[in-house]
Amino acid sequence: MKTITLRPGQMTLADLRHIYQHPVHITLDESAYVPIQQSVDCVQAILAEQRTAYGINTGFGLLASTRIATEDLENLQRSIVLSHAAGVGEANDDAIVRLIMVLKINSLARGFSGIRLEVIQALITLVNAGVYPHIPLKGSVGASGDLAPLAHMSLLLLGEGKARYQGEWLPAHTALAQAGLQPLTLAAKEGLALLNGTQVSAAYALRGLFEAEDLYAAASVFGCLTVDAALGSRSPFDARIHAVRGQRGQIDAASTYRHLLGERSEISESHKNCDKVQDPYSLRCQPQVMGACLGQIRQAAEVLAIESNAVSDNPLVFAEQGDVLSGGNFHAEPVAMAADNLALALAEVGSLSECRISLMMDKHMSQLPPFLVENGGVNSGFMIAQVTAAALTSENKGLAFPASVDSIPTSANQEDHVSMAPRAGKRLWEMAENVRNILAIEWLAACQGLDLRKGLRTSAILEPARQLLRQHVTYYDKDRFFAPDIEVASQLIAQRHMNELMPAKLLPSL
């Protein structure tokens, strides 16, 4: 198990990808201790001076003008956790919960939240022990923070709710015991600090980012396999074409295709003197389309990297000046828009792949047997697999509608504009699954097309992708039950083998 030392505000996307994909051991760098304690001291000074400060000794939301008596402050913090734990739906899986918890730890440890080191260390202990609180998928609108899901996370610290340990749901007290912890009593400001923040929105979008990167890599590889299967030209990937336009994503995408296709292969040499002038757009314009998608992925990654290191609590404690300021860092609009950009990229990656699949079905376009099968008529080949790809592509067009343009007022109109960032991030998972299956069909089709070229080999870099599939799925010499082959190919894509074929540093978290 990898140990990751958190230096608050310095987590990388590579760290976050690892935390999402693997159990980890977290330690907190000692440089965080002083700022954390200073923020706690500032809160205590405000209480000692009997100053009124939102979130410390007042109610919340529309009840912010209600002053809370000192003897009720601990009960206030417990009450906010209990009352706000109102999420619904299935539980998030362990990977997402682990990512949420580490994002919350990273934010609290910046020292602007007025929360004790003891509470932060309790969250770290839970992560290290593999004890994951029950956090429902639904219930947040992404402002004021991800209140409901983070309240469910915080219930466990109070000895309430339930948690999963080694795949089994346990009552909170039992789960805490597995980590060697006792229930905590939260002090002033701490309940609100735990609940307020964009960590759930960010975690949902980060999963979408990681899947978008993996699928971008797979689509690049399979797009090149299709170029060779359809006897496409390499000339559209010439660096000079892309340099004169100047779009960075396009330039990098074209470079990737040159890397994958190589200068020549048996297949490319077999048709280099053919009389075909231009390929269809789904082959020829891959750098332009995929380059634009790469730009969206990179832009979203930049936003999410910043947000993953952000302080999105409210109010914020500025201990050096002794100030507690109310603002709106809990509003997850940047995350929502980043997720919307990822949705556009995913939709287009899948759409372009479906176009290439359709091209291979057409004997006039691909110079391959109709539907990629011999003895057509008796055999239908890939006919309906292409229909499935079309159905999934259409689904993603609907799912790509921006979530960030929606808003519903909440909290008696005190919180009258919200981001819908959790929805923006969560729908990426469904889109990614659709794209994965579209790409699985293209992979199957491209390898079938290559096999129909009577053994001509593609490039040295692409051949391992072809061979990997053929280790699990055999050539279609006649019709057979098709769905299991799509599932096998999809699972292989999910194992991220195609990332290994990509140029270094092309994608932000790899």
Swiss-Prot record:
Organism this protein belongs to: Yersinia pestis
Family matches, as CDD domains: PAL-HAL
Record's subcellular location: Cytoplasm
PTM annotation, UniProt: Contains an active site 4-methylidene-imidazol-5-one (MIO), which is formed autocatalytically by cyclization and dehydration of residues Ala-Ser-Gly.
One GO cellular component term: cytoplasm
NCBIfam families, per database record: hutH, PRK09367.1
The reaction(s) this protein catalyses: L-histidine = trans-urocanate + NH4(+)
Gene Ontology biological-process entries: L-histidine catabolic process; L-histidine catabolic process to glutamate and formamide; L-histidine catabolic process to glutamate and formate
Organism superkingdom: Bacteria
Gene transcribed to yield this protein: hutH
Residue numbers of 2,3-didehydroalanine (Ser) PTMs: 144
Protein keywords: Cytoplasm, Histidine metabolism, Lyase
Chief subcellular location: cytoplasm
Protein name: Histidine ammonia-lyase
Positions bearing the 5-imidazolinone (Ala-Gly) cross-link: 143-145
EC number: 4.3.1.3
Pathway: Amino-acid degradation; L-histidine degradation into L-glutamate; N-formimidoyl-L-glutamate from L-histidine: step 1/3
One GO MF term: histidine ammonia-lyase activity
Family: Belongs to the PAL/histidase family.
